[in-house]
Structure formats: C-alpha cells, structure tokens
C-alpha cells in the first residue's frame, strides 16, 4: 500500500461529505460537510484546496452504481463531478469507487453512536465519506485497490479498471471517466 493522505468525497445533490486518512493510510476520519454549489463550483474549489493543504496522494470519489452494477443517472452526475475535480486539482489522481452501501453503513454507524435521525443531516455525508474511504483503505491493504483512477491529459483520460484478482486493463475513457473501447487509429 502506498503511504500518504487520501481524501474521500461523498457527493450528494445538496451536500458533499469529506473524509481523510492519516499519512500511513490506516484510519479514515471525518473532515467536514460542504454545501453543493453547482453554479459556481465553490465546493469543487474547496475540495481542491483541502487536497493540496493535506498533501493528498489521491482523492477517492464515491460512484453510486445501481444495485445491478450499472451506471445510472446518479453515477453519471458523479462522473461529471469527478471530471470537475480532475480539472481543479490535476496533480492529484481521482479514484472512482463503488459507494452503493456507504450511506447505509453511515446510517448504521450514526445510529450506533446514539444520534437521532434529525441530527444525521449535518454529518451523514461525512460519515458516508468515512465508510467509503475506510473500505478503500482496507481493500488497498490486501493489494487490490478498488475502482478506477481517472487521470491524464485534458479531454482524454485513461481509466484503470480493476477486475477480480486485482488485475487491471487499460481502456480509453471520456472526460468524465467513463470507459470507452479503444479506437484503432490508422485503419483504412
């Protein structure tokens, strides 16, 4: 496992939860909750500033896949958000990780901590980011980093897909990180 701070982002339609881990990558902790700012992207700028201030080696972004594993409208919005982060802080890789059960895990943890449903709103996004990041750290310690990394030159990024057993295959991805098959150049 690579050492270094990772920042996790749980993006919702109204709020964005942030979590970070220690430099050894052992434990995830809540950072704060941001208010979404779709018109001006102040939330994205705050994420970039937080990543730089902490010297993050990676940003983990929750990808809300459908229960069948497909990318529905929520996942497409998250992919667009990932692209904004990549453009805002290009020196830090963004890893897209399946977050299907992170909010459920966050609710369970908050209930176990004795919080009431009314108190959840302020912290549930942070808690979901903690669940997402801790699962990512735990998986990476086994040698199988989950999800895929969005990185590369503007407009044409490579996404590294992890399959069973941790083997990866490279595919071209669009600006939002969505995989596309390679186009063969020079055929004619």
Curated annotation (Swiss-Prot):
Its main location: cytoplasm. It holds the Pfam family RuvX. The keyword Nuclease applies. Residues 154-163 have a biased composition (Basic residues). CDD domains: YqgF. GO terms for cellular component: cytosol. One of its GO terms (molecular function) is nuclease activity. The keyword Oxidoreductase does not apply. Residues 144-188 are annotated as: Disordered. GO terms for biological process: rRNA 5'-end processing. Keywords: Cytoplasm, Hydrolase, Nuclease, Ribosome biogenesis. InterPro entries: RNaseH-like_sf, YqgF, YqgF/RNaseH-like_dom, YqgF/RNaseH-like_dom_sf. It is found in: Cytoplasm. Its EC number is 3.1.-.-. PANTHER family: POLYNUCLEOTIDYL TRANSFERASE, RIBONUCLEASE H-LIKE SUPERFAMILY PROTEIN (PTHR33317:SF4). NCBIfam families: RNAse_H_YqgF (TIGR00250). Belongs to the YqgF nuclease family. Could be a nuclease involved in processing of the 5'-end of pre-16S rRNA. This is Putative pre-16S rRNA nuclease. It comes from Kineococcus radiotolerans (strain ATCC BAA-149 / DSM 14245 / SRS30216). The lineage of its organism: Bacteria, Bacillati, Actinomycetota, Actinomycetes, Kineosporiales.
């Amino acid at each position: 496992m690579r050492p270094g701070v990772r920042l996790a982002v749980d993006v919702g339609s109204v709020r964005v939860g942030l979590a970070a881990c220690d430099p050894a990558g052992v434990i995830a902790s809540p950072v704060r909750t941001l208010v979404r700012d779709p018109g001006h992207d102040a939330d994205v700028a705050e994420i970039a500033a937080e990543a730089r201030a902490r010297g993050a080696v990676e940003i983990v972004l929750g990808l809300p896949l459908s229960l069948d594993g497909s990318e529905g409208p929520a996942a497409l919005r998250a992919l667009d958000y990932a692209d904004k982060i990549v453009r805002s802080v290009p020196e830090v890789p963004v890893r897209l990780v399946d977050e299907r059960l992170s909010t459920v895990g966050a609710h369970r943890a908050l209930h176990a901590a004795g919080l009431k449903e009314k108190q959840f709103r302020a912290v549930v996004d942070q808690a979901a980011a903690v669940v997402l990041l801790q699962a990512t750290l735990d998986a990476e310690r086994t040698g199988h980093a989950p999800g895929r990394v969005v990185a590369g030159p503007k407009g044409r990024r490579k996404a590294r897909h992890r399959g069973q057993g941790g083997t990866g295959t490279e595919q071209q991805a669009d600006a939002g990180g969505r995989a596309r098959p390679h186009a063969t150049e020079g055929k004619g």
